[in-house]
Amino acid sequence: MKKLLYLLIVFFLGFASQAQIVAEATLKDSLVNVKDESINYQNQTLDDLSWHGRRFKVSAGVFFPTNNTEVEVGSNNGEFGNLIDFEKDLGFNKNTVSFAAAFEWRISRRSRLGTEYFYLKRTASKVLQREIEFGDHVYPVDARVSAFMDNQIYRLVYGYAFISKPTYEIGALIGAHVMFADVGIRLEGNTAQAEYRDNFDFTAPLPDLGLWGEFVLADKWGLYVNANYFALKVDNVDGRLLSYNLSVLYNVYKNFSITAGYTGLNIRVDVERERLNGFFKWGYNGPTIAATYAFGGRVKLYKH
């Protein structure tokens, strides 16, 4: 009886030991399989993001900026006029609607080149509440004037990602905003002889430096943020620029997405000419919405 009991104990101990070995091996294999499946799933998920990591990206949409514009233009005799607030003094609407477009080329894993275009045309008519000096003329109190401001901004920017991962990238920017501006005032008289006008136009190349970040938030969601600043005098143009942008992307279908965000730009330009000097300060900020299409091959992004 005791021998039988000892044989049973030895049998159960051996069975338990073998079961533990098998269980540990099975658990180890299961963990490896889960890890491999997780990696494969993550890679498959990233590969399924048709909007992310493409060579080319083009977008176009509308911008709803709130403007704040100040202009001061001197006369041909070298004397400056007075500072004019275009919204307050000339009746320009602060809130406007404009067109914006952008194109991006991902040259390599870390390098990208982009262009942007922004256009805004504004007009106003108002009876003056105070005397205004602009260019060679004085516009008296109670006179009706019409005014205009045309702005076009082109931007060329190069970005380099010093951190480049499949789901997020962070890098530096170097580029330039080139602004083509034309502003003017016209006195509306009863006769053609009573009318007179002045305008001031200039081109301002404004270089900038900045930082940017791009993040994959989910299968259909992405986030982009950038900020830029620079101040420099180039020939007869002394300029300062501060810009920023925050936008969220939602992938609607395959390579087509919608982006919504908030953008701001503040520019100050002093222009010196032989017979005419001008000061121009313009700031705007507001929401944007655009359609974005990504195409071309996919840039390889590494986890390490």
Question: Model-flagged regions — what are they?
Answer:
Residues 110-113, 166-168, 219-223, 255-258, ...:
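Repeated loop/turn-to-beta-strand initiation elements of outer-membrane beta-barrel proteins
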Residues 222-239:
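Transmembrane beta-strand segments that form the barrel wall of outer-membrane beta-barrel proteins
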Residues 55, 96-100, 151-155, 204-208, ...:
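Transmembrane beta-barrel architecture of outer-membrane proteins
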Residues 4-13:
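Sec-dependent N-terminal signal peptides
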Residues 20-117, 288, 292-298:
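Short glycine/proline- and aromatic-enriched beta-strand/turn motifs that initiate or cap beta-hairpins
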Residues 1-4, 20:
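Positively charged n-region of N-terminal signal peptides that target proteins for export
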Residues 60-62, 101-105, 156-160, 174-178, ...:
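Residues on the lipid-exposed face of transmembrane beta-strands in outer-membrane beta-barrel proteins
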Residues 68-96, 119-152, 179-202, 232-235, ...:
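Extracellular/periplasm-exposed beta-strand and loop segments of Gram-negative cell-envelope proteins
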